[in-house]
């Protein structure tokens, strides 16, 4: 059976050829290797028709142009040579589009990313819509790759090398007005006239290339270029800690093209693409992509979700304000906040105002749209307006009696169908639901701070939670833009449970003489975004350590924190960044101020901070405890799969993405090697390092958590 073409050609009466992109059976247009023959057949027709005045590429999808290349193509490559050949095929196809003798225009609406932008760059002009859905970027670096179809060569010549490097090295996505300002697109128009605007541009004479800004022209010269690449290389190395080989190859390939010409640049690009595709870092990053995509498709349970027309929030503090923002402004669901104090309501409203006003200032949002979104949020000091709310999110203090009281009040003041979701980070959901008249509608919905930035939520049903309650809560989390994992109702749930021994070990090393900055730097070098001591300061030392006694009571001595250290720090009024002093000292300007280690911390905990062990040893001690606890969570079915475990660790605590998550990292080392390391550490430092039974058994049998493919489990 012949495959329906993803590219169709229609010649208008004005002799403009319109090529419509519509991948059959898919919501998103993605480029596949088999499309090359389709495009070449169309190019042949275009060349044969001497009456044509121009060509326009446009998408038939409602909200995307081309979202990128199909990543499965890379996974199907067994060697670097196969992946390189894939890149060369893409380069050749883009070159054939660019070589057409008539004006070729890309009419862009929605996501234009990766291979989609490379196709647009191969065109002679680009018009995009002013819709918020329209974004342009080259995100391949986030998969451990570089643009392989000419993007590293065309983009610097179009918008300048420094701007192009920023886009390619970070995967940054541009909105329409930003793209216009940088010269990436030639015009920005309403969606309703996109095709006609592109057609008019296609009819015009091909313009000479737009002159680059003076700064970019200086940086394109040999001296400026040498200085730029040295500075960018140094900055990139500091940011990546050498853990992401793609960034180094991007710099190398872009510089080759500028110094030696496009032919050498394309050759270097294809070679680098092939080699990067085979790196363990790219394989791990692609596994995270597939896993997160899979999680987003998971409904959480087999039951159909209930309607979600309105949400209530109890508590207008930092978490309540953040939850209100993502519910109203991301999910588009009306929110009513209840707080006993009018100041709490004002705080929550101001939180959303600050977020939206920032978008208006950056021209990412119109003032009218800001006002429309803010109108979805209202407040009250009692339960007026709560009677028909479909779901209530409780974000009050971590106190069991208070949360049980909230359940009782919601059941008294809200409808019989209303779901009660607690944002607890440590209290058992079963205990919160203990006195509920409708316990099947009580569930945990654990957000991470700051709510608007952290992508993960944990959804925690207790033994009596209904399947529909689970499905409805998962549905809400997805609408809020979150990646939800369903976890079992056990102490610490998943993320805090694997994080606690990691932080405990860092504090223990601190008491044994290691310096704060040495510990943090060691884990940043390993690949975490911040070190464990700094993380504790950011979360709040009082907040971050509150869960330790809960975990110790549930799981025993391996969760005990170093005696008296935490109490000594808290008794000295050290809460972390929020009160300006923790392990670090912070200036008076709040969150943007520069921090420095407070030397007074060492005598406070009874050490001189002289340090004795290497950075890799520091990282090993912290990370091995995290891995061991993650395996226990699988064994106890705290998480439903190692997929959820990897996603939870990467999205919830910043476990190094280039390692793929705790379980993929164990597989890369080998379970037997992890067991050997832990047994050595147990001999040196104590029984808390004893490897769990599941890990020992897997090591003995040579088993892995994941199969060889990026998406399947054993």
UniProtKB/Swiss-Prot annotation:
Xref: InterPro entries: 3-OHacyl-CoA_DH_CS, 3-OHacyl-CoA_DH_NAD-bd, 3HC_DH_C, 6-PGluconate_DH-like_C_sf, ClpP/crotonase-like_dom_sf, Enoyl-CoA_hydra/iso, FA_oxidation_alpha_subunit, FadJ
Localisation per UniProt entry: Cytoplasm
Residues marked Important for catalytic activity (site): 118, 140
Induction section of the entry: Unlike the aerobic pathway, the anaerobic pathway is not strongly repressed by FadR regulatory protein.
Pathways involved: Lipid metabolism; fatty acid beta-oxidation
PROSITE patterns found in the cross-reference section: 3HCDH
GO cellular component: cytoplasm; fatty acid beta-oxidation multienzyme complex
Disulfide bonds: none
GO molecular function: 3-hydroxyacyl-CoA dehydrogenase activity; 3-hydroxybutyryl-CoA epimerase activity; enoyl-CoA hydratase activity; long-chain-3-hydroxyacyl-CoA dehydrogenase activity; NAD+ binding
Region of interest: 3-hydroxyacyl-CoA dehydrogenase: 306-714
Function: Catalyzes the formation of a hydroxyacyl-CoA by addition of water on enoyl-CoA. Also exhibits 3-hydroxyacyl-CoA epimerase and 3-hydroxyacyl-CoA dehydrogenase activities. Strongly involved in the anaerobic degradation of long and medium-chain fatty acids in the presence of nitrate and weakly involved in the aerobic degradation of long-chain fatty acids.
Subunit structure, as described in the record: Heterotetramer of two alpha chains (FadJ) and two beta chains (FadI).
Family: In the N-terminal section; belongs to the enoyl-CoA hydratase/isomerase family. In the central section; belongs to the 3-hydroxyacyl-CoA dehydrogenase family.
Name recorded for this polypeptide: Fatty acid oxidation complex subunit alpha
